Every structure is written in C-alpha cells, then in structure tokens.
C-alpha cells in the first residue's frame, strides 16, 4: 500500500466504528443515520480501491472476464459446473452439438499460450453454427462465374499492363 491508501483505509475504519447497530427498539431516524454512515464508509472503501495501483493487464483481464460472463449470462462461475451436470443429453437433431470435455486440447503453438489454462476446468459457451453442403457452394461459385463476362483487353503491347488473358478468363496480377 502507498501511504495515501493506508490513510484512506484508516479513515474508513474510523467511520465504520461509528456506525450504530440497529436493534428492534431503535427509531427510524437512527436507521437513516446508519444508512448514511454505511454509504460514507462505502465511498471511502471505493476511494481506497481506486488509489491502490493495479497493473493495466490485471484491469483488462478483469474487464474481459466480466464482459464474457455478461455475454454468456453466467451469474456465478462456480455454479457453471453444477449446471452442466444437471443438463439432459442433447442430440444433433435439435441443432445443438456438445463437445466432449475429454477431447484433447489444441496442439497448435498459439492455441494454448498460457500453461495455466491447462489445469482450469472448461466452460461452455453457446455458439450458433450454420452448415453449407459442398454442392451448394459449388453451385454458387459456378453461377457467379457464368454470370460475369469479361472482354479480352486491347493488345497494345504495353509493358505496364497488370492483367493477363488466359484460356478465355481474365486474370489480374500485382506488379
């Protein structure tokens, strides 16, 4: 802690000591005072947290994890494992495919860049995938080639031309 942080922490604890404890016999006015003092304590703790220097990488990681949990709508990461166990088996006809957790991890050099991730338990993320059969993609490619017609370029003998005409098709080349 820096000296400034220690001073703020001391001030926060001094305020916390002055917060009265409410029992059933206390009045509404005392409850309001307690609420005010609690909010004041929370403000000092928040200031303290901001005054402690954290490396930018830690802040970025925390923000990334929070965004990821929001996107996946995970309230508590510890409950994630329990939900996976309780879920009934799903089949491919429902359009949902489940990857076996025993499946090996990627062997690519960039796939698992941090060795710490090997010991962590995986989490499930919903991904929507569309499958296009090979025959559809071929017909799309041939349709687009048939519909575009190129006329052969004028043969002026220029050496600066950046295009070639071969076998009835027009190619563009980078110089």
Swiss-Prot record:
Q: What does the record say about PTM?
A: Glycosylated.
Q: How does it sit in the membrane?
A: Single-pass type I membrane protein
Task: Recite the UniProt keywords alphabetically.
Answer: Cell membrane, Glycoprotein, Immunoglobulin domain, Membrane
| Localization, UniProt | Cell membrane
Instruction: Give the Polar residues compositional bias ranges.
Output: 145-175
Which residues does the annotated region (Disordered) include?
A: 85-175
Q: Cellular component terms, GO, for this chain's entry?
A: plasma membrane
Q: Which PANTHER family match?
A: MICROFIBRIL-ASSOCIATED GLYCOPROTEIN 3 (PTHR14340:SF4)
**In its UniProt entry, what is this protein called?**
Microfibril-associated glycoprotein 3
């Amino acid at each position: 802690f820096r000296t400034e942080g220690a001073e703020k922490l001391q001030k926060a604890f001094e305020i916390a000591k002055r917060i009265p404890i409410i029992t059933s016999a206390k009045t509404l006015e005392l409850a309001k005072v307690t609420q005010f003092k609690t909010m004041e304590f929370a403000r000092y703790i928040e200031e303290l947290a901001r005054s402690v220097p954290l490396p930018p990488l830690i802040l970025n990681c925390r923000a990334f994890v929070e965004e990821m949990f929001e996107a996946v709508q995970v309230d508590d990461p510890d409950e994630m494992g329990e939900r996976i166990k309780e879920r009934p088996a799903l089949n491919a006809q429902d359009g949902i495919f489940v990857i076996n957790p025993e499946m090996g991890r990627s062997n690519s050099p960039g796939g698992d860049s941090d060795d710490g991730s090997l010991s962590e338990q995986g989490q499930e993320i919903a991904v929507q995938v569309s499958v296009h059969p090979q025959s559809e993609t071929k017909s799309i490619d041939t349709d687009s080639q048939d519909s575009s017609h190129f006329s052969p370029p004028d043969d002026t003998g220029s050496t600066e031309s950046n295009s070639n005409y071969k076998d009835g098709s027009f190619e563009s080349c980078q110089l």
